[in-house]
Curated annotation (Swiss-Prot):
Protein origin, superkingdom: Bacteria
Classification lineage: Bacteria, Pseudomonadati, Myxococcota, Myxococcia, Myxococcales
Encoding gene, per UniProt annotation: glyA
Cofactor or coenzyme needed: pyridoxal 5'-phosphate
Originating organism: Myxococcus xanthus (strain DK1622)
Protein name listed in UniProt: Serine hydroxymethyltransferase
One GO location term (cellular component): cytosol
Subunit composition and interactions: Homodimer.
Coiled coil: none
Residues with the N6-(pyridoxal phosphate)lysine modification: K229
Subcellular location: Cytoplasm
EC number, UniProt record: 2.1.2.1
């Protein structure tokens, strides 16, 4: 039969892409804070026959027949997410974090309503009201930022703007903020002005699940997340809420902004949630934070400045201005050395978003490989050496060899290269 031929037989070009990407992940150091390595079990679920099944609607209330089996998968995902985060209601159908946010916003606001959120240049996310994003086009957006001296959230500004603009929703969450988020303080401000509180915990969901970071679930009205990043599941979205918001959220996700859910991805989410309920996952999350602190110290020893002076979570922002480098150049230099990071705006950055003055560095992926504090000292040193050798391709090639040697001691998907 045609459909039982292997990928290499059907499409050798894509088979080569898979092999080369596996090799890149295997031999390099993945330090992009939003990336992680899923388990073979998650990959098995996502690459399964569930990709064949349409299932518009929700368990027990589908618009298609033959959904009795996939209903089991979705109900498992919902139950496990409730258990993991202590949420009243859960929607696991959002295809991405952006769609989770869109559904949540539409459940809370009408077009033209006001939201108060962290500015993108201060570490926020584009779905939190960036002018070029749907959120900035549909809603009136007021942004809060950071203090110049501490480079942490300026709560005096948050409170002042909330009182002035009376937002319908206060959005809490970030894509590049290395410090603990004070959810209780945001709740206090939201209550004072009659605003709903939405937390986007996409970056810290794994830390929250393990109790390593305070949970927003008891204090927020709605919590959104991705299911990858620190949660280490497949790429997708998740919405947690108090029960009164559940019906509105569900109707906005489907049929509001999506059609059929991705049942193979929902099954992968269920697997990831089960993994996240284990004691091993909690230990893993603790190690992510320990590794981040160790890596931050190593980078500082290498002469690099970190915004806010360090990190409380899984990521850090490196200010490259003292090195006379841009984030764009640093990303390219480190890539030559087999170290993957992403250029990132830093607080009060004078550069443009495609240039930036910094890079974002995170530890979830290398912690999944089994690396610990001792390896973080090595990684920090190698980053420093690579940036100091920005114009020396021979030196960068030597560092890449050291990176490969280090990585080979912590195999990931090596069996897939055989």
């Amino acid at each position: 039969m045609e459909n039982i031929r292997t990928l290499a037989e059907v499409d050798p070009e894509i088979a080569r892409v898979l092999r080369e990407e596996t090799q890149r992940q295997e031999e390099g150091l993945e330090l992009i804070a939003s990336e992680n390595f899923v388990s073979p079990a998650v990959m098995e679920a996502v690459g399964s026959v569930l990709t064949n099944k349409y299932a518009e609607g929700y368990p027990g209330k589908r618009y298609y027949g033959g959904c009795e089996v996939v209903d089991v998968a979705e109900n498992l995902a919902i139950a496990r997410a409730k258990d993991l985060f202590g949420a009243d209601a859960v929607n696991v159908q959002a295809h991405s974090g952006s769609q989770a946010n869109m559904g949540a916003f539409m459940a809370l606001m009408k077009p033209g309503d006001t939201m108060l959120s962290l500015d993108l240049n201060s570490g926020g996310h584009l779905t939190h009201g960036a002018t070029f994003n749907f959120s900035g086009k549909l809603y009136k957006v007021v942004h809060y930022g950071l203090t110049r001296d501490t480079e942490t959230i300026d709560f005096a500004q948050v409170e002042s703007l909330a009182k002035e603009h009376k937002p319908k929703v206060i959005v809490v969450g970030a894509s590049a903020y290395p410090r603990t988020l004070d959810f209780a303080k945001f709740r206090e401000i939201a209550d004072a002005v009659g605003a709903a509180m939405l937390v986007d915990m996409a970056h810290i969901a794994g830390l929250v699940a393990a109790g390593v970071h305070p949970s927003p679930v008891p204090v927020a009205d709605i919590v959104t997340s991705t299911t990858h990043k620190t949660l280490r599941g497949p790429r997708g979205g998740l919405v947690l809420s108090r029960e009164p918001y559940a019906k509105a959220i569900n109707s906005q996700i489907f049929p509001g902004i999506q059609g059929g859910p991705l049942m193979h991805v929902i099954a992968g989410k269920a697997v990831a949630f089960k993994e996240a309920l284990s004691p091993e996952f909690k230990a893993y999350q603790r190690q992510i934070v320990a590794n981040a602190k160790a890596l931050a110290e190593a980078l500082q020893r290498a002469g690099l400045r970190l915004t806010s002076g360090g990190t409380d979570n899984h990521l850090m922002l490196v200010d490259l201005r003292p090195k006379k480098l841009t984030g764009k150049v640093a990303e390219e230099v480190l890539d030559k050395a087999g170290i993957t990071v992403n250029k990132n705006m830093i607080p009060f950055d004078p550069e443009k978003p495609m240039t930036t003055s910094g890079v974002r560095v995170g530890t979830p992926a290398i912690t999944t490989r089994g690396m610990r504090e001792a390896e973080m000292a090595v990684v920090g040193r190698l980053i420093g050496e690579a940036l100091d050798a920005a114009q020396d391709d021979a030196a960068l090639a030597r560092i890449k060899g050291q990176v490969k040697e280090l990585s080979q001691g912590f195999p990931l998907y090596a069996s897939r290269l055989k």
